């Protein structure tokens, strides 16, 4: 599986996880950046477009989801993206940040996202890291930090 195919499968799996999470009181509006003709593109947040953006208008809950392959978690580009996303969520009434990664990359994803959240004094924003088995995104493990 190429890097872009792997990223696309992570985005799709993350969108399904977010949509199916029990946090929603109502079905959320979900925007997913996979250009499949079935979903609209997520909005720009700062200068960055997340892979998934979900919102329940009635409860003001927003979830920003980002999928990262193993080689793309701990770098400047991701740091800038996550900074934009935590800035947005920090000023939202209710929000969560979700990160979808390959199974063996969960520790790095938790470390990077918690570090940026702490740097921005946004510890009140929940982080959910979903680690998927490569090639079988129905096998996953979830960490909420």
Task: Please give the residue ranges for each predicted region.
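Conserved catalytic cores of phosphodiester-cleaving nucleases, focusing on short active-site segments
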Residues: 52-78, 82-85
């Amino acid at each position: 599986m190429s890097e872009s195919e792997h990223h696309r499968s992570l985005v799709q799996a993350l969108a399904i996880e977010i949509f199916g999470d029990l946090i929603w009181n109502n079905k959320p509006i979900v925007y997913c950046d996979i250009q499949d003709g079935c979903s609209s593109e997520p909005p720009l947040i700062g200068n960055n477009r997340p892979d998934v953006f979900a919102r329940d208008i009635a409860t003001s809950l927003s979830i920003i989801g980002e999928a990262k392959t193993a080689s793309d978690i701990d770098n400047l580009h991701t740091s800038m993206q996550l900074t934009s996303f935590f800035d947005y969520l920090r000023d939202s009434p209710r929000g969560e940040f979700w990160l979808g990664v390959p199974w063996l990359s969960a520790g790095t994803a938790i470390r990077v996202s918690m570090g940026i959240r702490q740097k921005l004094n946004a510890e009140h924003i929940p982080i959910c890291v979903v680690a998927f088995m490569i090639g079988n995104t129905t096998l996953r493990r979830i960490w909420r930090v």
